[in-house]
Amino acid sequence: MIELENVCFAYEKEIALRYVDLHIEKGDSVVIQGPNGCGKSTLIKLLNGIIFPSEGKYFYQGHEINEKALKDSRFAKWFHQQMGYVFQNADTQLFCGSVEEEIAFGPVQMGLSEAEIKKRTEDCLHLFGLEKLRD
């Protein structure tokens, strides 16, 4: 169901994931734990299609997950309906003032630029047909 093959990811000069292999079958329970800075959040972002491997491959249900695949709106909608995660401090996410703020919450927590947050929020509003409900 989920497979990573020799996945690497780096933030500029800082290596976050180095040659990670992972195989998770449907029904498996998985815990990702480790000290600060070991790559847990990076791995979760990668599994959710927020970032992509600089090396290696990521497969979900036999489909390679990469930037090109997720540019296909039908595929992206299918994938994002299947995959998601809960933030470590989920209580702070509840009850944003608008649908737009709720969608932007994740990218804000990831520390993305204002322009990238706006782009991703607009993409999600469009993908799920929520433009009229943004406010």
Each model region followed by its residue ranges:
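Short coil-to-beta microelement around the adenine-binding A-loop and adjacent beta1/P-loop entry
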Residues: E14-I15, K77, K132
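Conserved hydrophobic segment flanking the Walker A/P-loop of ABC-type ATPase nucleotide-binding domains
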Residues: I24-K26, W78
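The feature captures the beta-strand-to-loop junction immediately N-terminal to the Walker
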Residues: Q33-P35
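Helix-to-loop junction immediately C-terminal to a conserved catalytic motif
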Residues: N48
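Conserved ABC transporter NBD signature motif
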Residues: G56-K68, F79
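Short helical segment in ABC ATPase nucleotide-binding domains corresponding to the A-loop/adjacent helical element
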Residues: D91, G97-V108, K118, E122
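Conserved ABC ATPase "signature" region
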Residues: A115-R134
